[in-house]
Amino acid sequence: MLLGFVGLGAVVETAYLPAIRKFFDTPPHCLGFDIQPVKQPEGVTRCSTLSELLSQPLDTLFITTSSLHHLEVLEQALASSVSRIVVEKPIVATLPQTEKLNALLASPDAASRVLALDHWMARIETVKRSLVGNVSDIVKIDGFLQEPSGYNAAGEPIALNFATGEPDARTLRHPDGVILDIGTHVLAMLRETVRYLGGNDEMTLRVVTAKDRLGRDIAKGDLTTAEGEAHLQGSISGVPVDIWLNKYAGPDGGQKGLRIYLRDGRIINHDRRGAEDVLELINGDTRQCWKIPGTIYEHCLAEHILGVNSLFERDPHEVSRTTRRRIEEVTLLLALQQQLRGPH
């Protein structure tokens, strides 16, 4: 197996490569290209140009650049012979890009080759363990991604690297706020769960609150400041949802998942704790608990992309449908940005 990566940043080094090493007894050969020569993660052989990488007999190509550059790389990849192209979230970064992407994927041949990835779409343990019979059994769902954070010398909150826990040196700017950057994760997990329970693709969302890193409201016309926290509210397949996003939740942060409230009074809580997912079924004073070890990327790559029963193999038509759902989610989140900040 020969894998290719365009963009060799932190997500490749801290998420993809460890998951690949865990999955394969003998790791596959990996090739990569990045416009920054200093980026050379261990286990990846660099190509000097993107064209050189795309000319190789790749089994799967991963597009892991910054989101603003996903589309331009995807266009070149579709012009090559690579048959499986996986694009990191969000698949695009602006509304004009979504229009161009939709035109690009209007061809069934192109659409069948492209999988828009959000690794949280593999977090469907509620479905796998048959804890809910049908979407009609659900009263409401809370989705949440509350990232732990630290403090700088001035006592201001600072983001931490999701994999290492070290301070994130980047200065985050719009559109890299929580609505698009991590809202995609929660929305993908919620929609996939609801879909498998018999729900449809209908969804609505509005911004209840959006604040910057220091807790100040995002002002109309502000096209620079990234949201540090946000509360979104709406519905998915008619089920009321609240989504809570916070990149600066302090030392008590770390909650990552969903909470489902059932009509019979039971509550399902799916969270991330340490190196494992934890699923709980709460019925009054009774609590059942299941633990799912391994990283989310390990499960997603194994179940959807690299395994013998990958989505490309078991249900080729679902590849384009999955991508369509991820595009719908990104489009909605980008539209929320327009409403929050004004047209841009």
PLM feature segments, named:
Residues 27, 80-84, 109-112:
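A short helix->loop->beta-strand "cap" motif at the edges of active sites that frequently abuts
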Residues 45-86, 90-104, 123:
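Beta-loop-alpha module in the N-terminal Rossmann-like domain of NAD(P)-dependent dehydrogenases
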Residues 220-229, 233-304:
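NAD(P)-dinucleotide binding in Rossmann-like oxidoreductases
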